């Protein structure tokens, strides 16, 4: 409180991490009540409902999601989660992490601890904000990905000589599709202008 910092509360106690959403919620409630005794506002409290690896505790994966929802609906504070913990020790971690991130966001997750180098995780957050109407007019999404889209089209334009007409059309390269169509027509009909 003295320095204006936020509080992060982990939903574990002397008995460890509860296996149920209700158990984690009860710990979160105690954390919030104790923090308020010290003058910390709910808006400055982040509750971590703790994600555990599905390779060891698969039954608890959805309990974390339920706990996030319970905290958001009943305690009026924010939530935080180390999303990639879910996939530790599992191949194709990216697929699990993205799916779990989307479930957590849907339950009310406010702050995701993720690998920001994993582009698909960042893309998922921007997409979620559009779909959930948090990004009004899709402004942040468009700003973030307009350049990416244009960069991809520029790269594809440079290499379109190696692509078939079907490939060019599937990639949405209108100018290249037109040019390639004219090229194909010219090569098949000497009288085509």
Predicted regions and their residues:
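ATP-dependent carboxylate/acyl-activation modules
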Residues: 1-43, 52-80, 84-193
């Amino acid at each position: 409180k003295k320095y204006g910092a936020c509080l992060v509360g982990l939903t574990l106690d002397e008995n460890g991490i509860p296996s149920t959403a209700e158990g984690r919620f009860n710990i979160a409630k105690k954390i919030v009540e104790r923090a308020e005794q010290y003058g910390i506002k709910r808006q400055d409290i982040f509750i971590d409902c703790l994600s555990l690896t599905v390779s060891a505790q698969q039954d608890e994966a959805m309990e974390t999601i339920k706990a996030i929802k319970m905290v958001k609906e009943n305690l009026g504070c924010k939530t935080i989660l180390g999303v990639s913990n879910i996939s530790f020790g599992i191949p194709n971690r990216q697929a699990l992490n993205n799916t779990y991130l989307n479930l957590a966001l849907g339950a009310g997750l406010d702050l995701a601890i993720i690998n920001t180098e994993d582009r698909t995780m960042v893309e998922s957050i921007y997409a979620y904000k559009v779909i959930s109407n948090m990004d009004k007019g899709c402004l942040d999404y468009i700003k973030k990905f307009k350049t990416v889209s244009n960069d991809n089209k520029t790269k594809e334009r440079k290499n379109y000589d190696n692509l078939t007409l079907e490939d060019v059309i599937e990639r949405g390269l209108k100018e290249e599709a037109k040019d390639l169509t004219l090229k194909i027509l010219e090569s098949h009909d000497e009288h085509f202008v």
